[in-house]
Amino acid sequence: MEIQGTRFGTLEFDEKEIIYLNEGLLGFPLSKQFLMFPYGEDSSFFWLQSVDEPEIAFIVINPFDFFSDLEFAVEDEDASSLVLARSEDVEIFTLVTIPEGRPEEMRTNLAGPVVVNVQNRLGKQILCKDYSPRQPLIPDSMRSQLKEQARSSKGGHVAGGR
């Protein structure tokens, strides 16, 4: 199978690679089939590419790579709809937003993780009221350093003169 996307051009894939989000994502109810692939080599980021609407792609992460103390509770109803039998069959991803020109301010939506049953490729975005929908990925101390580095590299120095 293949899709023609605006971001990646032609993507060839096998049907068994599709993740099925039968309820779509919040704000994107028509996108129900997705492909997921690494953002880059050795990256903690992934692309979640809509098969139904090829112009739509999201950056996602495994939030446990960034926040070791997270605990997401999958309600029985959600587990049932995903046909989850074992916790080992679950992978969880969160959507990332990166403000244009301000990557140091990237955030992830911990309040709306996407839960995927890796055995049957069924997924669902669930709601977690205990977490922020705009959780910074970069600690405040590092953000300040990155902003300062960006400012100094933009400003540059003019040499010469009389």
UniProtKB/Swiss-Prot annotation:
Q: Which InterPro entries match?
A: Flagellar_assembly_factor_FliW, Flagellar_assmbl_FliW_dom_sf
**What Pfam families does UniProt report for this protein, alphabetically?**
FliW
Q: Give the matching Gene3D superfamilies.
A: BH3618-like
Tell me the domain of life. Answer: Bacteria
In which compartments does the protein localize?
Answer: Cytoplasm
GO term, biological process aspect, one = regulation of translation
Keywords recorded for this protein, A-Z: Bacterial flagellum biogenesis, Chaperone, Cytoplasm, Translation regulation
Give me the Gene Ontology terms describing cellular component.
Answer: cytoplasm
Coiled-coil region(s) at which residues? none
Q: How does it assemble?
A: Interacts with translational regulator CsrA and flagellin(s).
Q: Which family does it belong to?
A: Belongs to the FliW family.
Query: What protein is this chain from?
Result: Flagellar assembly factor FliW
Could you tell me which species this protein originates from?
Answer: Magnetococcus marinus (strain ATCC BAA-1437 / JCM 17883 / MC-1)
Q: Which gene encodes it?
A: fliW
